[in-house]
């Protein structure tokens, strides 16, 4: 947006940025939001929009820095639980995008883990903090060699089980399936250890059968269960 002889306000730049964002021109939209914030740096809400735009443009460094700036500047609602949750998700996305560099990936994922841990501390009965800690750990340990996500998925299930209706709700039902699948596969990998074989087979069947109760048409798990009989 070229001002020419006109004088544009922060609101004008925000409006144009919104138009560009709807067109998925996130780089250009970000430039407009930056101008808006330069004109009115009392509007901390612009920082949140700007961070989201950077994230959509996969500029995670700026997205994280800007969201942290938003959290520090928002004196009214500073450091709400949801802020830590959203910042954790940005860090998680950054970690996933940085898998070519283990060091960088781990840095972002550990930062995400720290954010989700705050969510758990402030809202211990909200399963989402546990779930996203599980996911961050799973990305750090993709071959399940260390089972980093195992205790975290177990904690997720413990929290979900506090409300029996969670197995009926679509969103939490998917979380159950995700956790059962991971824990079943983790135990399946333990069947190669003779000392743990029988216990691991039983645990695998338990988790995967629980998964099938919620997702009976899952052919992948149905076939995987058949392989257990040949072990």
Protein language model regions, located:
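Conserved structural position within tetratricopeptide repeats
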Residues: 2-4, 31-38, 68-75, 114-121, ...
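Short coil turns that delineate tetratricopeptide repeat
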Residues: 6-7, 41, 75-78, 124-125, ...
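Canonical tetratricopeptide repeat
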Residues: 15, 49, 85-86, 132, ...
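Residue-level recognition of tetratricopeptide repeat
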Residues: 18, 52-55, 89, 93-96, ...
């Amino acid at each position: 947006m070229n001002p020419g002889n006109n004088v544009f306000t922060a609101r004008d730049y925000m409006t144009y940025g919104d138009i560009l964002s709807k067109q998925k021109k996130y780089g250009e939209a970000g430039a407009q939001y930056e101008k808006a914030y330069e004109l009115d740096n009392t509007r901390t809400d612009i920082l949140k929009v700007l961070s989201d735009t950077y994230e959509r443009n996969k500029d995670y460094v700026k997205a994280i820095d800007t969201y942290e700036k938003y959290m520090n500047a928002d004196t009214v609602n500073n450091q709400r639980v949801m802020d830590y949750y959203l910042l954790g998700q940005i860090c998680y996305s950054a970690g996933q995008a940085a898998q070519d560099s283990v060091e960088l990936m781990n840095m972002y994922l550990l930062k995400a883990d720290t954010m989700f841990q705050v969510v758990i501390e402030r809202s211990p009965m909200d399963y989402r903090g546990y779930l996203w800690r599980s996911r961050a750990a799973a990305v750090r340990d993709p071959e399940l060699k260390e089972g980093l996500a195992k205790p975290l998925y177990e904690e997720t299930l413990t929290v979900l089980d506090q409300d029996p209706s969670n197995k009926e709700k679509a969103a939490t039902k998917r979380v159950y399936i995700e956790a059962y699948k991971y824990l079943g596969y983790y135990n399946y990998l333990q069947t190669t250890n003779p000392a743990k074989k029988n216990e691991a087979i039983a645990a695998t069947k338990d988790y995967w059968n629980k998964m099938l109760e919620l997702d009976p048409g899952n052919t992948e798990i149905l076939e995987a269960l058949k392989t257990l009989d040949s072990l």
